[in-house]
Amino acid sequence: MDLEREYRAKTGGSARIFARSKKYHVGGVSHNIRFYEPYPFVTRSASGKHLVDVDGNKYVDYWMGHWSLILGHAPAPVRSAVEGQLRRGWIHGTVNEQTMNLSEIIRGAVSVAEKTRYVTSGTEAVMYAARLARAHTGRKIIAKADGGWHGYASGLLKSVNWPYDVPESGGLVDEEHSISIPYNDLEGSLDVLGRAGDDLACVIIEPLLGGGGCIPADEDYLRGIQEFVHSRGALLVLDEIVTGFRFRFGCAYAAAGLDPDIVALGKIVGGGFPIGVICGKDEVMEISNTISHAKSDRAYIGGGTFSANPATMTAGAAALGELKKRKGTIYPRINSMGDDARDKLSKIFGNRVSVTGRGSLFMTHFVQDGAGRVSNAADAAACDVELLHRYHLDMITRDGIFFLPGKLGAISAAHSKADLKTMYSASERFAEGL
């Protein structure tokens, strides 16, 4: 039986539900990347490292809620804390103490988090970070990296997918005040930034491209960018929505010796609930204070109806509290497992792949025509994406291993070395058929 027929035979219930979903939802989904061919399975439940679909199929999950569930699905400390909060209400629309509890943990782990604001998504967090930078500097130009993904805010939806000179979407105006720099190319980046002159407000960059291919930034590259922007009176904004609390208890920038002005957080810090965090130095964040700043000179960060709701704040504090308590065991273990995954997959597939990532994140790129190391999003886009999708669908169908097809994998505290061995065996079987 061919792969697609085998998948369809195992997921008939999902097929029926997804056909119904297409009657109500554009493309059948509410997030573009959740669709994959021939159709996505429909999840019934999740616990620990497992997803269970409506047909009863059980999967070891490496997607882990868009990489946000570092403790696994529904971990007991988070579940217990949230259940207690739900008995007291989940949105009040007023100030709650749970917000302070989470902020205290973040400040203790993130050196630049002198002040914090909460929103409900990473998109909002980075959008507001850009606004803060413009208001603080009085400048207009925002620079991002080619392949950098910062959510769907119009001003930053630029140069995300190759080819970079083609607009990412209809409905966008020409964003003349947003520019893009080549990731991991310091000389090329400084050339672009230099042409912005004295109107450069900030550079927004990820320490590891998440959506762009799970590609770490060279530390010398990041330090060179920081030195340049600070010498020009501009700000360094780090998008650590993927990397924050992923490799260590805190942010990735600390290991590189960076001193950002603003950091955007999300995913892990919400404990599996919707969150976006803008945090930064006092002198930058203060401009958003509507009590002390008039309309004409403030950066308006209003939040939203559900921002800093007590359910999310409770979940986030519980998740970070558990990570803090177990940081001496969780991080060394899952980072080591990630190192092993990159090493073993590289050996299994040989020169057919470039396996990227850092710590507990990894991604297999099937390179074409003997291309070498994948070091930026353009390199990733030149790989055989269709083969990667087939590899992932093969493991979903035949091995009960779930990667969102085409995306990176995230190892959680719920995974074991035995899980990795099962993935290696599945990969060896797939490699033999190439």
Curated annotation (Swiss-Prot):
PANTHER family: GLUTAMATE-1-SEMIALDEHYDE 2,1-AMINOMUTASE (PTHR43713), GLUTAMATE-1-SEMIALDEHYDE 2,1-AMINOMUTASE 1, CHLOROPLASTIC-RELATED (PTHR43713:SF3). It is found in: Cytoplasm. InterPro entries: Aminotrans_3, Aminotrans_3_PPA_site, PyrdxlP-dep_Trfase, PyrdxlP-dep_Trfase_major, PyrdxlP-dep_Trfase_small. Its cofactor is pyridoxal 5'-phosphate. It catalyses: (S)-4-amino-5-oxopentanoate = 5-aminolevulinate. The modification N6-(pyridoxal phosphate)lysine is found at K267. GO terms for molecular function: glutamate-1-semialdehyde 2,1-aminomutase activity; pyridoxal phosphate binding; transaminase activity. It holds the Pfam family Aminotran_3. GO terms for biological process: protoporphyrinogen IX biosynthetic process. Pathway: Porphyrin-containing compound metabolism; protoporphyrin-IX biosynthesis; 5-aminolevulinate from L-glutamyl-tRNA(Glu): step 2/2. It comes from the Archaea. It comes from Cenarchaeum symbiosum (strain A). Its EC number is 5.4.3.8. Its main location: cytoplasm. This is Glutamate-1-semialdehyde 2,1-aminomutase 2. The keyword Isomerase applies. Gene3D superfamilies: Aspartate Aminotransferase, domain 1 (3.90.1150.10), Type I PLP-dependent aspartate aminotransferase-like (Major domain) (3.40.640.10). The keyword Isomerase applies. GO terms for cellular component: cytoplasm. It is an enzyme of class 5 (isomerase). Keywords: Cytoplasm, Isomerase, Porphyrin biosynthesis, Pyridoxal phosphate.
